[in-house]
């Protein structure tokens, strides 16, 4: 069975404007048992939820995955792999040093995606393409 992870940006679009509703609905309808939710995405969404209503909307997204045990959380090995990838990027592109802290969560998400043999869906072409130059993983960049 194919496995899928959805990046934070697509869920933000879903919550704020509904622009990704058709994409997410199609994926859920086609392959619901193969969809997983990353604890990284949960953290990023909760960090952006400034109201009680926003928090409830975010929790409504990941609670079903908690109930069925399909939450993906980076392991110690994933953190080490992410560190090695970020070091390699810095070695190849010293001009990106100030960008590295912003890449940590994306790198952890990429490493998690790769380790479980999943496909990651995102709109963030630039950051994930940069990570793919160092470590391959399955990626679908949406519109």
Where are these regions (language model features)?
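Short, well-structured N-terminal submotif of metal-dependent ribonuclease cores
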Residues: 1-37, 47-63
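Acidic, PIN/NYN-like endoribonuclease modules and their adjacent C-terminal/linker elements
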Residues: 1-3, 110-143
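Histidine- and aromatic-rich ligand-binding microenvironments
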Residues: 6-7, 38, 101-103, 124-125, ...
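Alpha-helix capping/helix-boundary segments
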Residues: 10-11, 41, 78, 108-109, ...
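A general structural signal for well-ordered alpha-helical segments in protein cores
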Residues: 38, 42, 55-58, 79-82, ...
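Short, hinge-like loop/turn segments at secondary-structure boundaries
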Residues: 52-56, 89-90, 138-141
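Active-site neighborhoods of divalent-metal-dependent phosphate/nucleic-acid chemistry enzymes
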Residues: 70-119, 123
